[in-house]
């Protein structure tokens, strides 16, 4: 009689995952069209990232500035949350940027750089800004 251990047959079964519908509403994370964007900085004035939006594709997102490291990533969560909250309230993407400008507070850990609202030809341009050293 062999004492060889056999693997549990359940370990060889395929797992079935059924995608559940629903979840919170989200703006599309991509667009091929032009985007409006805001520059976001920390208290010291160091750029931590960019919030962008395009109404035609119902798209918006947050691009963290890679050179900002973990600190920029952590501070950027606040701005990504603002976009998620705006979408949940049915706010158009560029209107969400306008809210960010209105609610920005220079005394917080990060803020919209005054006068930074700009337009870019595409999302790739903003991603390029975020990837600069």
Model-derived features with residue positions:
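Mixed-charge, Lys/Arg-enriched low-complexity segments
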Residues: 2-17, 63-133
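Short, hydrophobic/aromatic-rich segments at coil-to-beta transitions
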Residues: 32-39
